[in-house]
Amino acid sequence: MKEIALEFLKIINGFGYEAYIVGGFVRDYIMKIQSHDIDITTNATPQELKNIFTNVKFPKNMNDQDCYGSVSIIYKNILFEVTTFREEYAYLDNRHPSSIHYVDDLETDLKRRDFTINAICMDQNGNIIDLLNGKTDLTNKVIKTINNPYKSFTDDALR
């Protein structure tokens, strides 16, 4: 599964975009736990991804996901949840941001995430990228929010 995910990244990178596996899959990989939940973060927009993966089925209605910069792509029978690098603003329903702004910076995108251990990335060569020290927290068995804990949990109640 990891090999197909890295292949998926290479396709996006081949079109001149950055792309990384992020979150639970990378965390579980480091812990040597098998995972089937593959999240990708990229500076490619949903429309640019649709242009890249013209022969790939998008299981969700793109219009529903465009406002959050997320698409689901099935590639080689594996579901990839792909999200454009972004900043989020004001959560009004305790689940979804009222607006987002695409950014071209991985670190800015990672800083909007929930926990440091879920902000660890893997590049197309399998290298671990840990800009927010999530590996240290993982080693020390610490779950630490990236932002103010109260704000993080009230913004998104599913955290």
Regions found by a protein language model. Give the residues of each.
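Catalytic cores of the polymerase beta-like nucleotidyltransferase superfamily
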Residues: 1-159
